């Protein structure tokens, strides 16, 4: 029989009492009052912060956006089909953040930085807030390096610099995404990390872009953030900020980044949907009053950092869709006023077979020639003026029955200049090829050729110059200037190729 020793029991109880730590844990909890349309109204959560993540009983995450006197309006980052009225919600004490790092290169992810390309998990130890403050004035420096798009019309007349925000605007089906993807393809070998953000697009369109980038070897340095048309409005609204956080990671690591938002009209529509469901007062075109801030805080994150911070850069190319060419609508005017210029794509030019369909007359870069190398500045200086004069004369020529010889020559020159701006999709040109093309057109070497032969001649001239005059490329690459030697080499190549081309054409006619 076991004897019970009272002193032993007393010692054990005393020991336990001494070890007892009375810790009171207060949880910031609430109860679901109403749920539907990816919006939940919560009673409680008295100490929740604006933008704080909240977690529902069944695991769905939401963001507290509306802090009202008697309830909290939460937008859901999922369908929320299992959330019931009366179920509990707890505040997490965290603001939305995502993992970032080199491992994301070449991957397709969603707004929560989860992979959606079926290639397994992405491991990363670094994190960045989705909503981060833009660099201040002291943290920036003026833009001075060009970001080459590979498109003659842009690089010569609407130059983009590293750290700039340049809007691509136009109606649907005018080639906005094509301009953006061509720019990504042209960054190959330029040590630029690209982030492509697809907002509210068809899954097939996103897949097409990814396939194009893979075929051209551009996915190696590109991250695709995609929230398709069937995604909740909350995730479509967050996707651009996720892309910006990823690009910022590389920018602050002293690297150069390019981010494309395709497109911000759909993000604004998703935000409008959320705001109306949260019963926020509607303003112009039913958008909420802070829709300008929605885009300004996103686009201000693009910057060219100061030398103290490593001179990294983040160049933003936001895309905005217009209706029937109306650039005076609410979202287009907002984004135009935030950005450092716009590239306007025209339906009429697109239908006339001028692609990329860039309307040079109303497109502008507010950084200008600061984002061009000296060689391009020297050669392309007159191009925009000549095209503007040609457009004016062409409009007049429709009504005039007979024109003098000078006007006829100017029209012929203008038509050839317009022809040399045409480019096939996914066929970007190097700076040397662009300078060669513009110089040939501006100096009248193409005037004697029939209009239909211009592109053929330029392609052959480009091949001839690469093969027989490699020194031309070397001079431009090393000095970035259009020296007398480079000009002499180019003139010689044009003369040689013109003779060969005309002989060849004559032989074909005779045959």
Curated annotation (Swiss-Prot):
It catalyses: ATP + H2O + 4 H(+)(in) = ADP + phosphate + 5 H(+)(out). Transmembrane segments: none annotated. It is an enzyme of class 7 (translocase). Its EC number is 7.1.2.2. GO terms for molecular function: ADP binding; ATP binding; proton-transporting ATP synthase activity, rotational mechanism. Its main location: plastid. The record marks 363 as: Required for activity. NCBIfam families: atpA, PRK13343.1. Produces ATP from ADP in the presence of a proton gradient across the membrane. The alpha chain is a regulatory subunit. Belongs to the ATPase alpha/beta chains family. PANTHER family: ATP SYNTHASE SUBUNIT ALPHA, MITOCHONDRIAL. This is ATP synthase subunit alpha, plastid. It comes from Cuscuta reflexa.
């Amino acid at each position: 029989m076991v004897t019970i020793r009272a002193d032993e029991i007393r010692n054990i109880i005393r020991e336990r009492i001494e070890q007892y730590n009375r810790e009171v844990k207060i949880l910031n909890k609430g109860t679901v009052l109403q749920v539907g349309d990816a919006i939940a109204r919560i009673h409680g959560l008295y100490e929740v912060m604006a933008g704080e993540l909240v977690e529902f009983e069944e695991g769905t995450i939401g963001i507290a956006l509306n802090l009202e006197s008697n309830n909290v309006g939460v937008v859901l980052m999922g369908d929320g089909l299992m959330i019931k009225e009366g179920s509990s919600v707890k505040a997490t004490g965290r603001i939305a953040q995502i993992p970032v790092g080199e491992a994301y290169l070449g991957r397709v992810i969603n707004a929560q930085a989860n992979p959606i390309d079926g290639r397994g998990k992405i491991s990363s130890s670094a994190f960045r807030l989705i909503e981060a403050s833009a660099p201040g004035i002291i943290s920036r420096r003026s833009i001075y390096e060009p970001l080459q798009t590979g498109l003659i019309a842009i690089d010569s007349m609407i130059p983009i610099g590293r750290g700039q925000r340049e809007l691509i605007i136009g109606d649907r089906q005018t080639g906005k995404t094509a301009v953006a993807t061509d720019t990504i393809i042209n960054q190959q070998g330029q040590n630029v990390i690209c982030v492509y953000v697809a907002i509210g697009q068809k899954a097939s369109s996103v897949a097409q872009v990814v396939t194009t980038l893979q075929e051209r070897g551009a996915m190696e340095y590109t991250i695709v953030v995609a929230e398709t048309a069937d995604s909740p409005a909350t995730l479509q609204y967050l996707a651009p900020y996720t892309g910006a956080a990823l690009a910022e990671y590389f920018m602050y690591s002293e690297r150069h980044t390019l981010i494309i938002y395709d497109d911000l009209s759909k993000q604004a529509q998703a935000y409008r949907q959320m705001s109306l469901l949260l019963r926020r007062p509607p303003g112009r075109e039913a958008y909420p009053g802070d829709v300008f801030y929605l885009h300004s805080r996103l686009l201000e994150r693009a910057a060219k950092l100061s030398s103290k911070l490593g001179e990294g850069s983040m160049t933003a190319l936001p895309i905005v869709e217009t209706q029937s060419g109306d650039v005076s609508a609410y979202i287009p005017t907002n984004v135009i006023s935030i950005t450092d210029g716009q590239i306007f794509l025209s339906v009429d030019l697109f239908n006339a077979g001028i692609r990329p369909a860039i309307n040079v007359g109303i497109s502008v870069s507010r950084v200008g020639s600061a984002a061009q190398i000296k060689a391009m500045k020297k050669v392309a200086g007159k191009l925009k003026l000549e095209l503007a004069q040609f457009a004016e004369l062409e409009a007049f020529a429709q009504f005039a029955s007979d024109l003098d010889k000078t006007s006829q020559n100017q029209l012929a020159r203008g038509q050839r200049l317009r022809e040399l701006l045409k480019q096939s999709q996914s066929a970007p040109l190097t700076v040397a090829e662009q300078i060669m093309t513009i110089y040939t057109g501006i100096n009248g070497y193409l005037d004697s050729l029939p209009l239909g032969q211009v592109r053929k001649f330029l392609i052959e001239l480009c091949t001839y110059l690469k093969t027989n005059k490699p020194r031309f490329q070397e001079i431009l690459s090393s000095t970035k200037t259009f020296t007398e030697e480079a000009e002499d080499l180019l003139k010689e190549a044009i003369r040689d190729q013109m003779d060969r081309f005309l002989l060849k054409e004559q032989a074909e006619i005779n045959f």
